[in-house]
Amino acid sequence: MYKLLKKDGSSRRGEFSTPHGVVQTPVFMNVGTLAAIKGAVSTEDLKEIGCQIELSNTYHLSLRPGDEVIRKLGGLHKFMNWDRPILTDSGGFQVFSLSGMRKIKEEGVYFNSHIDGRKIFMGPEESMRIQSNLASTVAMAFDECVENPAPKEYVEDSVKRTTRWLKRCKIEIDRLNSMPHTINNKQMLFGINQGGVHDDIRMEHAKIISDMDLDGYAIGGLAVGETHEEMYRVLEKVVPNLPENKPIYLMGVGTPANILEAVERGVDFFDCVMPSRNGRHSHVFTSYGVIHLLNAKYELDDNPIDSECSCPTCKNYTRAYIRHLFKAKEMLAMRLCVIHNLYFYNNLMKEIRESIDKGNFLQYKKEKLEKWNETV
């Protein structure tokens, strides 16, 4: 259940109550695709750096270790030792990214495993059953993610199919939640708005799925080929057509600057692999933009990554030391940078929430973007 606490322009400050705890929004979901953050970051680390909610992937976990294995071990929370909310992606984005290996039918999608090439089928019911086995807090509806740009006629047909699939997802999750052996019989369902960069399709689809009274609504099919300006325009068209009393999630986005722009347009939830992926490659976010620790100028730099940061990495280690670890190919280098980047993102969201509470979000956003000098 979502409670809107404060609005500052279109930006929203809220609370999302779940069976696994309350999430303060706007929020960044830390991405643990295979039930772990890449970079040797533990769930204890995540709590220390302020992570409220974690995201894992249905498709990948269904292949390895298998959703039945996780079900038999008590569900994803118990499996990964995490007692806070978890959102599971439906697997749709991963399936549709296998463009040369899949066939879309009304019943679902036929594709080949990226691991061993075996043939797999996934449709709305299969996705819901896998997510029920995982026992995540929030299950995402199975949808088709169309890369931008795409022919309008195809996008229209795809959105209609996604709507039919959403109805099937809702029927199936209601059935699964009513069954006695279901681990989490209060699993929530978020629907996904699609429509590419076509405003009319997006707005009509938002109105249709809003009538289905879901637990939350995501905006998908962005950050897949369109410009930032197109993304922001789509948000301005879609968000006002979604229910104000439900959380709004922008999938797979993005940079800190993207997040600020989307919060200004009313978005509550975000996820992106960028902080962990960039950290593993020695790129770290700071109060003054992104720096690359492998640059020679950091060889004798005994400052922390960011003097304004309070993360465990910045409290204890220098740029020179972390650069040495990368040069020596020590795993600790990746761990320290991923922890720092995730702290940066989670702390950014905390500051955003505080700025909305104070009614000065736009001023906060302006100062941040100027300070980052558009490098974030």
UniProtKB/Swiss-Prot annotation:
Active site feature: D89 (proton acceptor), D271 (nucleophile)
Pathway membership: tRNA modification; tRNA-queuosine biosynthesis
Annotated residues for binding of substrate: D89, S90, G91, G92, F93, D143, Q194, G221
Pfam families recorded: TGT (PF01702)
Residue segments, region RNA binding: 252-258
The enzyme's E.C. designation: 2.4.2.29
Cofactor section: Zn(2+)
This protein's UniProt keywords: Glycosyltransferase, Metal-binding, Queuosine biosynthesis, Transferase, tRNA processing, Zinc
UniProt-listed GO biological process terms: queuosine biosynthetic process; tRNA wobble guanine modification; tRNA-guanine transglycosylation
Cofactor note: Binds 1 zinc ion per subunit.
Metal-binding found in the keyword field: yes
Positions bound to Zn(2+): C309, C311, C314, H340
One GO MF term attached to the UniProt entry: metal ion binding
InterPro entries listed in its UniProt record: ArchSynthase1/Queuine_TRR (IPR050076), TGT (IPR004803), TGT-like_sf (IPR036511), tRNA_ribo_trans-like (IPR002616)
Signal peptide: none
Cystine pairs: none
GO CC terms of this entry: cytosol
The reaction(s) this protein catalyses: 7-aminomethyl-7-carbaguanine + guanosine(34) in tRNA = 7-aminomethyl-7-carbaguanosine(34) in tRNA + guanine
SUBUNIT field: Homodimer. Within each dimer, one monomer is responsible for RNA recognition and catalysis, while the other monomer binds to the replacement base PreQ1.
Protein task: Catalyzes the base-exchange of a guanine (G) residue with the queuine precursor 7-aminomethyl-7-deazaguanine (PreQ1) at position 34 (anticodon wobble position) in tRNAs with GU(N) anticodons (tRNA-Asp, -Asn, -His and -Tyr). Catalysis occurs through a double-displacement mechanism. The nucleophile active site attacks the C1' of nucleotide 34 to detach the guanine base from the RNA, forming a covalent enzyme-RNA intermediate. The proton acceptor active site deprotonates the incoming PreQ1, allowing a nucleophilic attack on the C1' of the ribose to form the product.
Similarity annotation: Belongs to the queuine tRNA-ribosyltransferase family.
Protein name in UniProt: Queuine tRNA-ribosyltransferase
Species in which this protein is naturally found: Clostridium kluyveri (strain ATCC 8527 / DSM 555 / NBRC 12016 / NCIMB 10680 / K1)
Gene label: tgt
